[in-house]
A protein has these predicted regions:
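Proline-centered turn/helix-capping motifs that create local helix->coil transitions or kinks
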Residues: 65-67, 119-122, 167-171
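Non-heme Fe(II) oxygenase catalytic core, chiefly the N-lobe of the double-stranded beta-helix
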Residues: 59-62, 91-95, 100-156
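A structural signal for short, well-ordered beta-strand segments and their strand-loop junctions
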Residues: 44, 122-125, 131, 200-201, ...
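Fe(II)/2-oxoglutarate
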Residues: 1-38, 243-252
């Protein structure tokens, strides 16, 4: 039994890949702004994948009627759809699944490490709490600081990446990502969820953010985002000393 799912016709690979060269240039260009941003380190990069690719990804983003969504409706977050990773993104278009894989790949990790200065970043192939998110009309996400640990892998949360897929998004619809200062006295940055915009944010227990006002987009539209979280491991005093390969003695 094959572990792969193949479509009919000639074998075809993904139609896009993230360029390590371009990503490094972007990281060097933006790392100063990332480190000095207020209220906490973050950066906004527009035109990340290019309009043609971004529009194509937006066109295959799962609609609100997709059976695999899990809907959240409570005080902190309402009319928000997510959790497609519970089914390993079954039924999600291959281009979006490939984007998620690219966000976990070497070129993107190198980009994040150069941009932020955080070394040894570890992606989450299970996309716990991340993956694809869709907020519908009337939905919101209250101000919050993100969870700080991956309990399953004993890792510390370091970065959040958000990539928006909302063509023709209008400011009157709301949905701006708000970044608030540590004592919650004021909003210091607002980031509209427009098409092809990448946001990278540092994690912190006082890094308050959300989109707390109810969305006023038309029925049939939603606030679509791709999210990925990144972690680091903590050194253990019980860890053995590092060594290279141990070669067995030659047998006579």
């Amino acid at each position: 039994v094959s572990a792969a799912t193949l479509e009919e016709g000639p074998l075809q690979g993904p139609s896009f890949f993230l360029s390590r060269t371009v990503l490094r240039a972007l990281a060097l260009e933006h790392r100063g702004a990332y480190g000095t941003a207020r209220p906490h380190p973050h950066v906004v990069i527009d035109g990340f994948l290019g309009e043609r690719l971004a529009a194509g990804l937006a066109g295959v983003f799962p609609g609100a009627d997709d059976a695999h969504w899990k809907r959240r409706d409570h005080v902190e977050q309402a009319a928000r759809l997510g959790q497609l990773q519970r089914k390993a993104f079954e039924g999600v278009h291959g281009a979006l699944r490939h984007l998620l894989s690219e966000f976990s790949g070497m070129s993107f990790i190198d980009f994040l490490e150069t941009l932020t200065g955080v070394q040894g970043l570890i992606p989450d192939p299970h996309f716990r709490g991340a993956g694809l998110h869709l907020t519908l009309r009337g939905g919101h996400l209250a101000l919050h600081a993100d969870f700080n640990r991956d309990r399953f892998r004993a890792l510390s949360r370091r970065l959040t990446v958000l990539y928006y897929l909302n063509p023709g998004w209008e400011s009157a619809w709301g949905g701006d990502l708000e970044l608030w200062n540590a004592d919650l006295s004021r909003c210091e940055a607002r980031i509209a969820p427009v098409l092809d915009r990448l946001v990278v944010m540092a994690h912190g227990d006082n890094h308050w953010h959300g989109h707390p006002a109810a969305l006023e987009c038309p029925e049939g539209r939603g606030r679509a985002a791709v999210a990925a979280y990144f972690y680091t491991a903590e050194a253990s005093p019980d860890a053995p000393e590092a060594h290279s390969a141990l070669w067995a003695p030659a047998r006579s």
